[in-house]
Amino acid sequence: MNPENYLYLSVLLFTIGAAGVLLRRNAIVVFMCIELMLNAANLAFVTFARMHGNLDGQIFAFFTMVVAAAEVVVGLAIIMIIFRSRRSVSVDDADLLKY
């Protein structure tokens, strides 16, 4: 498969993720769309690394996955706290948190 096709797929995945972040109100769906955007960036990093014949993009993608794993832990904990206090995971309810 042509490497440019992977870049097109990466752009498509990133666009779908960005549209989901902007259009959806459910915090879990927004969270999944952010993860989709991170995976699209990882695909682009690995594709560029493959095209240029070095490992820098693959190493950067690995570190991005490590940061994304930490983001999952913190993000889901915050979503659970919002759900316990508001009984909803809507993004609109999250801006009302004070305590």
UniProtKB/Swiss-Prot annotation:
GO molecular function: NADH:ubiquinone reductase (non-electrogenic) activity; quinone binding
EC number(s) stated in the UniProt entry for this protein: 7.1.1.-
Keyword Ligase: no
Protein's GO biological process: ATP synthesis coupled electron transport
One Pfam family it belongs to: Oxidored_q2
Catalytic reaction list: a quinone + NADH + 5 H(+)(in) = a quinol + NAD(+) + 4 H(+)(out)
One annotated Gene Ontology cellular component of this protein: plasma membrane
InterPro entries noted in UniProt: NADH_UbQ_OxRdtase_chain4L/K (IPR001133), NUOK/Mnh_C1-like (IPR039428)
Residues annotated as transmembrane: 3-23, 28-48, 62-82
Domain of life: Bacteria
Membrane topology type: Multi-pass membrane protein
Location within or outside the cell: Cell membrane
Keywords of the record: Cell membrane, Membrane, NAD, Quinone, Translocase, Transmembrane, Transmembrane helix, Transport
PANTHER family: NADH DEHYDROGENASE SUBUNIT 4L-RELATED, NADH-UBIQUINONE OXIDOREDUCTASE SUBUNIT ND4L
NCBIfam families in alphabetical order: PRK05715.1-2, PRK05715.1-3, PRK05715.1-5
Function: NDH-1 shuttles electrons from NADH, via FMN and iron-sulfur (Fe-S) centers, to quinones in the respiratory chain. The immediate electron acceptor for the enzyme in this species is believed to be a menaquinone. Couples the redox reaction to proton translocation (for every two electrons transferred, four hydrogen ions are translocated across the cytoplasmic membrane), and thus conserves the redox energy in a proton gradient.
Subunit structure: NDH-1 is composed of 14 different subunits. Subunits NuoA, H, J, K, L, M, N constitute the membrane sector of the complex.
Family indicated by similarity: Belongs to the complex I subunit 4L family.
Name of the molecule in the record: NADH-quinone oxidoreductase subunit K
Organism: Rhodococcus erythropolis (strain PR4 / NBRC 100887)
